[in-house]
C-alpha cells in the first residue's frame, strides 16, 4: 500500500522505535513504584525523554513536560485546568475537535465565553481579529499550529506576541507540527504546548504530552496513584506528578525516546525539506487537472498536506476507490474540523486529504498523481 494518511498517524516507524518498544516490554518496571532495577530503569527512560522533549520544544524545565496518551488528553488537561468562571477565550476556525469540544463544553457549562477568529475561503486566519476580539477578561488564546485539513500554518510567534502583550495565556495544539516543524516555546511566547507522538514525531500511538512554561498553574484533570506523597489526600502539587496520576505508558515512552534520537540524528529541517518536496511535487502534478479543486493557501507556510475534491464526487467514495483500486491510503470526510469545512464550503462533500511523511517517496507521489488524473477523467 502507498500510505498517504500521515496527518492521521505516521504508519512507518523507524526500526529503532520498534526495537525500543520490544526491549522495554521485557525490561521496564513501573517508574516511581519501586527501588529495584526494573523500576529505576523505567524512571530513567521517562526522565531522559522529558529532557529530550524539553530541548526539542524550548521548554525550560523538563519537570514541566507532562506525558499523556495523545494531544486530545493534553488539551483536555490544559483547557479544564486553567479557566475560572467568567474567563473569555479566543480560538480559531482552523481548529480540530480536540480543541473545539472541550471549549464548547466549558462554554455550555457557563465557565467561559468564546469567540473565534474567522478563516477565509482559503483557510487563512484573520490576524487582525486576534487583537480585535481581545477583552479585559480574555484568559487565553487557544489555537492550532497547523490545520489538519489544509495544512495551512498559523504564525504562532505572531499570535503569541499578541497574547503576551495582552496578558493572556497562549495554548498551542501542535498535533500536526511536532517533529515536522521547528518549535521554540520561549521564542514564540507559547505558554502551553500540546503534542502527540504518533504523527510527526514517528513514535508509538498512545504517546503525547504537554509542555508548560514556568509559573503556569494547571489544576489536575485526574487524580490517583503518584508513587510519592501517598499519605496526602490530594494529588501532589509539583509537576509532573500533579498531572500524571496512574502508571505511565512506559513502553510507548521508550519508543518516543528512540524516535526523538532518530529525529535529532536526521534533523527536523531535513525531514521538513523532504516532506515539503513531496507535497510540492504532488500539488504541481494535480493542480491543473480538469475537475480538481484544491483547498488552502500554497503561498504561505504550511505542512505536507494537499486536500482536494474531484468534480462533485463524494469524498468518501473517492478515498474508497483510491484504496481499493490503486492501493493508496488517504483520509476523506470531515477530518474532525467542522468550522474549517464551513469556511471552505465543503461541509456536504467533505474532502480527500493526501499527507506525506519522511518515509514516502517520489514514486508514491507519482502513483497518486496518476490515480487522481485517471479518476478525474472517468
Locate the predicted segments by residue.
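Pyridoxal 5′-phosphate
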Residues: 1-378
Amino acid at each position: 500500500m502507498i500510505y498517504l494518511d500521515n496527518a492521521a498517524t505516521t504508519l512507518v516507524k523507524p526500526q529503532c522505535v520498534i526495537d525500543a518498544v520490544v526491549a522495554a516490554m521485557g525490561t521496564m518496571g513501573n517508574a516511581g513504584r519501586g527501588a529495584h532495577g526494573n523500576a529505576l530503569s523505567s524512571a530513567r527512560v521517562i526522565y531522559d525523554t522529558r529532557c529530550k522533549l524539553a530541548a526539542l520544544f524550548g521548554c525550560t524545565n523538563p519537570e514541566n513536560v507532562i506525558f499523556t496518551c495523545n494531544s486530545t488528553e493534553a488539551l483536555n488537561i490544559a483547557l479544564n485546568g486553567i479557566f475560572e468562571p467568567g474567563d473569555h477565550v479566543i480560538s480559531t476556525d482552523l481548529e480540530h475537535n480536540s480543541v473545539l469540544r472541550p471549549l464548547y463544553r466549558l462554554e455550555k457549562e457557563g465557565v467561559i465565553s468564546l469567540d473565534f477568529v474567522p478563516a477565509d475561503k482559503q483557510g487563512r486566519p484573520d490576524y487582525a481579529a486576534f487583537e480585535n476580539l481581545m477583552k479585559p477578561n480574555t484568559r487565553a488564546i487557544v489555537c492550532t499550529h497547523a490545520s489538519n485539513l489544509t495544512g495551512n500554518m498559523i504564525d504562532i510567534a505572531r499570535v503569541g506576541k499578541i497574547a503576551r502583550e495582552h496578558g493572556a495565556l497562549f495554548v498551542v495544539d501542535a498535533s500536526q507540527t511536532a517533529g515536522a516543524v521547528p518549535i521554540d516555546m520561549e521564542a514564540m511566547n507559547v505558554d502551553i504546548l500540546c503534542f502527540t507522538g504518533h504523527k510527526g514525531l514517528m513514535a508509538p500511538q498512545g504517546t503525547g504530552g504537554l509542555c508548560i512554561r514556568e509559573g503556569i498553574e494547571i489544576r489536575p484533570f485526574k487524580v490517583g496513584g503518584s508513587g510519592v506523597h501517598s499519605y496526602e489526600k490530594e494529588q501532589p502539587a509539583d509537576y509532573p506528578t500533579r498531572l500524571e496520576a496512574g502508571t505511565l505508558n512506559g513502553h510507548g515512552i521508550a519508543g518516543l525516546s528512540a524516535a526523538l534520537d532518530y529525529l535529532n540524528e536526521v534533523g527536523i529541517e531535513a525531514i521538513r525539506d523532504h516532506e515539503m518536496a513531496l507535497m510540492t511535487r504532488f500539488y504541481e502534478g494535480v493542480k491543473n487537472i480538469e475537475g480538481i479543486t484544491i483547498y488552502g493557501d500554497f503561498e504561505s507556510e504550511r505542512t505536507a498536506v494537499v486536500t482536494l475534491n474531484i468534480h462533485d464526487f463524494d469524498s468518501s467514495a473517492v478515498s474508497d476507490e483510491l484504496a481499493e483500486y490503486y492501493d493508496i491510503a488517504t483520509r476523506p470526510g470531515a477530518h474532525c474540523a467542522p468550522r474549517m469545512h464551513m469556511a471552505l464550503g465543503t461541509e456536504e462533500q467533505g474532502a480527500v486529504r493526501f499527507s506525506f511523511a519522511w518515509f514516502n517517496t517520489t514514486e508514491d507521489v507519482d502513483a497518486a498523481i496518476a490515480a487522481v488524473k485517471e479518476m478525474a477523467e472517468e
